[in-house]
């Protein structure tokens, strides 16, 4: 459902689910020659695996005058006609300027490369106007959240007016981006856990895993919105992010000083640590910090470091975690998670012009945790995940859609383990609340808003992300994470 996308990326609408494929157009109906002249492929240099195809939108044929028939769809104002394309697995729409809104609904459908069947139309959610423009160096494009569709060789897209009577003023440079993640740079990551039989596994984690958030002891913080009225005494807010080429420079940390650890992140996997080993590794001095969970590093999922901008952006501390979902099909295999993450990384950097992937961490349905944005998993790395609240926060995205589908217990447990450790490094109680200063978006810029220290994307931005079913798990996640910290 990058970081400023905050809205991003995490956006969630039931329409964004990958629906069962239905044969709408036979594969033979489209051939490579069907590609419109305006389509251009932009493969990467041979030195950078993967490629991106960029297709321009054409004006839709003018609809006939008169009222539309009952149930007839609104006429599209821009289209990418159905065509055969080079193989790809993820798509999204971009335009020239991030400060220009997309006043229309973008719908896409993809043709399965194996079966030749077309998916149903799926809606893409556009990031807020201005998202990413300041935080990502000022060159960010306007963009929708990306959608993973799996191996595909055909595509069709359309932009529909917001209402039947509304005129449409579209931003310049509107293009459909088709991303092939390519092979990973490394293949040293450990094999992921076995696939859950369904999106709702009936077994919890083993004894060496985090306790079940539904049964963990602790005090319930109560349901409700992640933000409370901004009344009362407010603590001073953190400063602006610092930038430096070395993670050890240009950053200030809060209590716990997680950024000062010298852990080695050059391998494919950071192994799980006991609580005692975590305290020794990160020199937490016996404070409340959960044991470090197993984390697949960027090397482990095959990140090509030539894609992203050099250097890193840091904030002073980490005061809260925002939970997202990626609003994609839940039917993927966990062994494909590295490919999905590589595709998102390429889309955020090459298509949206962000400095790096937007999320700080990603979690697949098997509960495997992946490092996201570069800069150090224990450091206060500024991401692009929750527009208006990327300062002093970390963004965690679960691969899948959880508006109507129950999130797998292994993924829920992984969020608890990750937040117990990450927030603990900075002295934060995952069952507590904190004040954050808005950078714009859902709340007026400069306004101080009170959040749960583990909040959903929808608490900080106008979106349904992380989906109603995952959002409903946040209370139990907070309780479990606090228990893992020894509170």
Question: Where do the PLM segments sit?
Answer:
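Primarily mature extracellular domains of secreted and cell-surface proteins
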Residues: 58-72, 96-101, 111-114, 128, ...
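C-terminal region of N-terminal signal peptides and the immediate post-cleavage residues
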Residues: 19-57
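Active-site acidic/histidine clusters and adjacent loop/turn architecture
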Residues: 307, 316-351
């Amino acid at each position: 459902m990058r970081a400023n996308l905050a809205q991003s990326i995490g956006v969630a609408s039931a329409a964004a689910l990958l629906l069962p494929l239905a044969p709408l157009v036979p594969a033979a109906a489209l051939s490579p020659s069907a590609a419109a002249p305006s389509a251009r492929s932009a493969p990467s240099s041979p030195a950078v695996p993967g490629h991106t195809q960029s297709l321009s939108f054409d004006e839709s044929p003018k609809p006939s005058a008169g009222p539309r028939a009952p149930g007839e769809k609104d006429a599209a104002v821009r289209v990418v006609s159905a065509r055969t394309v080079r193989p790809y697995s993820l798509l999204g729409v971009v335009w020239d300027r991030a400060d220009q809104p997309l006043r229309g609904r973008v719908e896409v459908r993809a043709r399965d490369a194996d079966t030749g069947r077309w998916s149903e139309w799926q809606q893409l959610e556009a990031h807020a106007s201005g998202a990413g423009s300041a935080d990502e160096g000022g060159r960010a494009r306007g963009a929708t959240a990306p959608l993973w569709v799996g191996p595909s060789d055909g595509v069709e897209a359309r932009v529909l007016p917001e209402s039947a009577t509304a005129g449409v003023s579209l931003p310049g440079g509107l293009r459909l981006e088709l991303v092939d993640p390519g092979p990973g740079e490394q293949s040293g990551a450990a094999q992921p856990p076995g696939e859950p039989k369904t999106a709702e596994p009936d077994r919890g984690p083993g004894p060496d895993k985090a306790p079940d958030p539904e049964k963990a002891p602790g005090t319930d913080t109560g349901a409700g919105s992640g933000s409370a009225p901004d009344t009362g005494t407010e603590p001073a807010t953190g400063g602006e992010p610092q930038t430096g080429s070395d993670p050890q420079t240009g950053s200030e940390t809060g209590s716990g000083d997680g950024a000062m650890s010298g852990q080695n992140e050059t391998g494919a996997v950071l192994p799980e640590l006991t609580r005692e080993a975590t305290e020794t590794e990160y020199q937490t001095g016996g404070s409340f910090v959960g044991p470090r969970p197993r984390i697949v590093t960027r090397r482990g999922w095959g990140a090509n470091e030539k894609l992203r901008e050099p250097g890193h952006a840091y904030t002073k501390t980490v005061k809260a975690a925002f939970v997202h979902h990626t609003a994609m099909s839940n039917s993927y295999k966990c062994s494909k998670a590295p490919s999905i993450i590589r595709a998102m990384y390429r889309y955020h950097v090459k298509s949206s012009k962000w400095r790096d992937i937007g999320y700080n961490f990603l979690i697949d349905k098997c509960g495997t945790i992946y490092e996201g944005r570069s800069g150090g998993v224990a450091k206060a790395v500024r991401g692009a995940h929750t527009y208006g609240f990327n300062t002093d926060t970390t963004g965690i995205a679960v691969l899948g859609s959880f508006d109507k589908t129950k999130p797998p217990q292994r993924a829920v447990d992984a969020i608890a383990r990750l937040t117990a450790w990450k927030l603990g490094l900075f002295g934060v109680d995952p069952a507590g609340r904190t004040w954050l200063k808005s950078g714009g978006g859902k709340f007026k810029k400069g306004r101080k808003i009170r959040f749960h220290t583990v909040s959903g994307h929808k608490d900080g931005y106008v979106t349904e992300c992380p989906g109603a079913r995952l959002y409903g798990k946040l209370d139990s996640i907070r309780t479990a994470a606090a228990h893992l910290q020894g509170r």
